Amino acid sequence: MLVDAFKDLPEIVSICKRSPRNGMMVIGGGVPRNTVQSAALASKKGMDYAVIMTMDRPEIGGLSGSTLEETVSWGKVKSAANKIMVIGDAMIVFPIIVASVLERLGEDFKRAPYLKPKGIGGI
């Protein structure tokens, strides 16, 4: 597997530009978090919502623990965005969040039409 954030960035920026609202859910941090946040900045829109789950703490200087207030100051997340930073183990926290979201969405949940993959029935 080859991971190349520079090749992914134009596609992510394009998705951000076409989407009526943008958000991110980041588990951990590092390059994936920075790539998504940079796409929001490049699209000149900023994120409308953000969830960051990390074990890193801003007090000790861990980059993955940089606060959402910092991302707002860069324009990567809108100041009025719904945002939360969860300090905890993703192996515990993530399944609980997913179960809660799926329960709230119910049977009416549908993928945004502009994000549906082509050729597989929109699943």
Which ranges hold each PLM region?
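Active-site rim loops that border cofactor/substrate pockets in soluble metabolic enzymes
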Residues: M1-I27
